[in-house]
Amino acid sequence: MKWELEKEIKLPTAALGLSTLPHSESLLVSCFDGSILRVDPRESTWETLGHHQSYASGVVSVLDGSMAVSAGYDGVLQWHHLGSGKTVAVEKIHDFWSWQLKASPNGRLVASVTGQYLCGGERYEPAQEKEPSIKVFDAQTQSMVAQFSHLPPVLSVAFSPDSRFLAAANMMGDVRVWDLKEQRLECSWNTPDFTSWGIIKSHHYIGGIFDLCFSPGGEHLLVCGMGPMRDPMAGNGKQTWQRLEWRGETPEKVGEIKDGDRGRGLMETLSWHPDGKVFAMAGRMAQGSWNVALFDAQEGSLIQGMDNKTRITRSAFSPEGTQLFLTGSKSQGEPKEGKWSEFGRLMIYQTVPSDEKTPPSEASEGS
């Protein structure tokens, strides 16, 4: 089985967040201009549910698809009722950006992470947080039910499959897991393989773990980003994922992308296929042959790599596993006749037999 591009939908601005909806073919997308969209991929149309005052970094569906929650660089959570299409609540939850927003698998919780990289000493290590870096909210009551500390900036967050544990990771490669029921730190771990110290041009730290997710059984964590660089502005660190076994006395790395399978570039999103046998990683490519790839979950080997010449920010499989949804952006280019191009993208891949290819005429919408 292979994956082929089925459809490419142009959006007005870069798409930063993505969520599927239960019992619906529609998708939720959050955008660079602050807008929250409900997209109908069949018709390539959308409606605007709400608007943030800065980049809308994430959007999720909760409460069995009856509500959408969005977060942005304005540090605000917005709650959108999908039946009426109206924004029903707005709350300032962070003094800085919401880097990432995730919903628990049971649809009852949402978690947002924040944190600003400020110099904390002579070695330019990050300063300690000024506010709790992780906040968890009840989807029904919209009230905060937990908050946890971490070293900022905290870039990524994930719930375990049973919705009991919460993991978060930062720029320095620190991963922490909390037990939400007991409100305690379960484990912590560090990997140096995602963080750069600038030797050329800029002397500071950069990079980090841009996404993480639990395995379907919950025993492992996958984390992704890119490898260290001498020039932090180059964006050419090695495409990287690692697998962590976190439940033991001492968390340990038990898997990693093979050198022969990877190129260079920032990897920003991970998604597990519903059958648990495959996972996807995507981002942007600086050098190599792919920016979207499917990996065998057991062996960790590359199954298929694809280059769609897009910076991918979020990914999600359809519930039945026959489609892979990707959001991101193309190069914006120069304005033509006073108008900027539609540089946001929603890409839909579908599974096809290995000897069958999607007709080129059906692969994109005006690309």
Model-predicted regions and their roles:
Residues 1-367:
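WD40-repeat beta-propeller superdomains and closely related acidic/aromatic-rich repeat-like regions
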